[in-house]
Swiss-Prot record:
This is Endogenous retrovirus group K member 6 Env polyprotein. The keyword Disulfide bond applies. Residues 90-632 are extracellular. The chain crosses the membrane at residues 633-653. Residues 10-20 have a biased composition (Basic residues). Belongs to the beta type-B retroviral envelope protein family. HERV class-II K(HML-2) env subfamily. GO terms for molecular function: structural molecule activity. The record marks 465-466 as: Cleavage. Residues 654-699 are cytoplasmic. Retroviral envelope proteins mediate receptor recognition and membrane fusion during early infection. Endogenous envelope proteins may have kept, lost or modified their original function during evolution. This endogenous envelope protein has lost its original fusogenic properties. SU mediates receptor recognition. It comes from Homo sapiens. Glycans are attached at residues 100, 128, 153, 274, 355, 372, 461, 507, 554, 566, 585. Pfam families: GP41 (PF00517), HERV-K_env_2 (PF13804), HERV-K_REC (PF15695). Residues 466-486 are annotated as: Fusion peptide.
Length: 699
């Protein structure tokens, strides 16, 4: 290869530099993110607030801690810039830039729960055996066994003390309770024959007689039938136990601490010595009757009990009645007899049979009670939605009024497999919550308002020079307006009636009715009817809110109200506390908020949906009437006279022109007829005189 060929093949150095320049220029302009476009809705950003800077500093500090980087001013600045860059570069969802309208919304039956408190009405608890446990019976529970025991972590608030069962502060403690009936006997040595039932119940305080709250509890004595003074007598059939509610002579205190004072007026039967006419060495000289400790042990350890004494055995506080605890401090609430049905089902009940015999020892009467048990009855108690049971390590914090539980289980039924190392918290579905929501358009009560607004934007803003075009299509516009208004009113009505009820029923079934679908074949049962009444009562309250509120037309599952959300008045922390169910001085004032929203709804209910928009259409069309343009001009008599003369002159001119046009038309018609006659003559003018020719032509 000669030097000339090498020079020809080697690219010139200057050309290489010239080809690299455009690439460098393009690399400088290349970006990895999408091109940012300024939209019409884009607004100028406001300067950052102190709260935003404080939050940015916290995020930067947390980032440096996670990355184990020393916190210096330079690193803090770089971390803050990185966070701002990441937030700004996040993709914005469609329509988010235009979501500048925030209103209060009422969401009925959200997927949230709250604790049932002592101030709530009693809960329906169903049992599978009403012979041994009084109450409504239902042996079909749980409806969804595969869903029992689902794990959940809760952190909810409360205002009144919550209902909790178990060995924990703020919960009612479990204990064994006995109920005794007397069976007639004819044996000469047998004084009495007994049937006794033992089961789990609610544990009273040991020193309840000395407690200062006992005297105060006397004023809360319920109005009911007093308990009998004799042991109830029943037949020899051990499978029959008749429960009869009664009020004991004294109340027992189940709880008296910072969580409140809980009392119970049901009888607490137990064996003790009858010391009537005996010496002071009788054990009943104690202030508190001697309780048989053996009977309060585990129900599975002993199947035979023997009580022996030189003093007669008596059964105190007669009556076959279930516990009915109620709160009396710091507030007074209703009785809750359903709680005992949950505790008694946590372990099988044991049935005892025995008698009391009288013997002689050392020339003294000797009394012996023999009790034997060979029968146990397993039980199951269940609740139905909207109620559920949270089982686990429940912690109640009275200072912050919060309830927490990690790795808890959601149940609807309790049976003999329950472990009392856990606690039971009774919860229910939230009836509704108030939350602020954002919309990409202003609040509208009816779709007719939205449709007519769009129509008016394209019609009423036109110039008056299009008056003749508007008149040509005026009937079409009226038809569109009427159709839109009718459709808006119809859709508004359907949202609050058929569609809303259908969506509400579907959503509520998916959320809370998944475990308890009412069986149509057994719908005539009383218990199903009672539960349905409770279930529908909450729905009626929700519907009552919907009828009182004016909602946005484009929502059906919840109601967006016309009340604008004011962040300065209700900050998000208040909303968060409301969602947690906490009610304190810092919580959202729901009653005040409801009054404001109802007032705003009343203002919008004064007009039928679409009436305001239709009135705007009528005013706009009236402005396009040409008569109104000169209405203000013809306000004087002289101007009116001039206008009349001008109109008469124009009319005269039109008449003169019409007459002239008519004469010209007649002349042209005659000439055409003459020409037609002359063209039809075959011989022309031969044989006729000149006079005739002249006359003919002149015609």
């Amino acid at each position: 290869m000669n030097p000339s060929e090498m020079q020809r093949k080697a690219p010139p150095r200057r050309r290489r530099h010239r080809n690299r320049a455009p690439l460098t220029h393009k690399m400088n302009k290349m970006v990895t993110s999408e091109e940012q476009m300024k939209l019409p809705s884009t607004k100028k950003a406001e300067p950052p607030t102190w709260a935003q800077l404080k939050k940015l500093t916290q995020l930067a500090t947390k980032y440096l801690e996670n990355t184990k980087v020393t916190q210096t001013p330079e690193s803090m600045l770089l971390a803050a810039l990185m966070i701002v860059s990441m937030v700004v570069s996040l993709p914005m969802p469609a329509g988010a830039a235009a979501a500048n309208y925030t209103y209060w919304a009422y969401v009925p039956f959200p997927p949230l729960i709250r604790a049932v408190t002592w101030m709530d009405n009693p809960t329906e608890v169903y049992v599978n055996d009403s012979v041994w446990v009084p109450g409504p019976i239902d042996d079909r529970c749980p409806a969804k066994p595969e869903e029992e025991g689902m794990m959940i972590n809760i952190s909810i608030g409360y205002h009144y003390p919550p209902i909790c069962l178990g060995r924990a502060p703020g919960c009612l403690m479990p204990a064994v309770q006995n109920w005794l009936v007397e069976v007639p006997t004819v044996s000469p040595i047998c004084r009495f024959t007994y049937h006794m039932v033992s089961g789990m119940s609610l544990r009273p305080r040991v020193n309840y007689l000395q407690d200062f709250s006992y005297q105060r509890s006397l004023k809360f004595r319920p109005k009911g039938k007093p308990c009998p003074k004799e042991i109830p007598k029943e037949s020899k059939n051990t499978e029959v136990l008749v429960w009869e509610e009664c009020v004991a002579n004294s109340a027992v205190i189940l709880q008296n601490n910072e969580f409140g004072t809980i009392i119970d007026w049901a009888p607490r039967g137990q064996f003790y010595h009858n010391c009537s006419g005996q010496t002071q060495s009788c054990p009943s000289a104690q202030v508190s009757p001697a309780v048989d400790s053996d009977l309060t042990e585990s129900l599975d350890k002993h199947k035979h009990k023997k009580l022996q004494s030189f003093y007669p055995w008596e059964w105190g506080e007669k009556g076959i009645s279930t516990p009915r605890p109620k709160i009396v401090s710091p507030v007074s609430g209703p009785e809750h007899p359903e709680l005992w049905r949950l505790t008694v089902a946590s372990h099988h009940i044991r049935i005892w049979s025995g008698n009391q015999t009288l013997e002689t020892r050392d020339r003294k009467p000797f009394y012996t009670i023999d009790l034997n048990s060979s029968l146990t009855v397993p039980l199951q108690s269940c609740v139905k939605p909207p109620y559920m049971l949270v089982v686990g390590n429940i912690v109640i914090k009275p200072d912050s009024q919060t309830i927490t539980c990690e790795n808890c289980r959601l149940l609807t039924c309790i049976d003999s497999t329950f472990n009392w190392q856990h606690r039971i918290l009774l919860v229910r579905a939230r009836e509704g919550v108030w939350i602020p929501v954002s919309m990409d358009r202003p609040w509208e009560a009816s779709p007719s308002v939205h449709i007519l607004t769009e129509v008016l934007k394209g019609v009423l803003n036109r110039s008056k020079r299009f008056i003749f075009t508007l008149i040509a299509v005026i009937m079409g516009l009226i038809a569109v307006t009427a159709t839109a208004a009718v459709a808006g009113v119809a859709l508004h009505s359907s949202v609050q009636s058929v569609n809303f009820v259908n969506d509400w029923q579907k959503n509520s079934t998916r959320l809370w009715n998944s475990q308890s679908s009412i069986d149509q074949k057994l719908a005539n049962q009383i218990n199903d009817l009672r539960q349905t009444v409770i279930w529908m009562g909450d729905r009626l309250m929700s519907l009552e809110h919907r009828f009182q509120l004016q909602c946005d037309w484009n929502t059906s599952d919840f109601c967006i109200t016309p009340q604008i959300y004011n962040e300065s008045e209700h900050h998000w922390d208040m909303v968060r506390r409301h969602l947690q169910g906490r009610e304190d001085n810092l919580t959202l004032d729901i009653s005040k908020l409801k009054e404001q929203i109802f007032e705003a709804s009343k203002a919008h209910l004064n007009l039928v949906p679409g009436t305001e928009a239709i009135a705007g259409v009528a005013d706009g069309l009236a402005n396009l009437n040409p008569v109104t343009w000169v209405k203000t001009i013809g306000s004087t008599t002289i101007i009116n006279l001039i206008l009349i003369l001008v109109c008469l002159f124009c009319l005269l001119l039109v008449c003169r022109c019409t007459q002239q046009l008519r004469r010209d038309s007649d002349h042209r018609e005659r000439a055409m007829m003459t020409m037609a006659v002359l063209s039809k003559r075959k011989g022309g003018n031969v044989g006729k005189s000149k006079r005739d020719q002249i006359v003919t032509v002149s015609v």
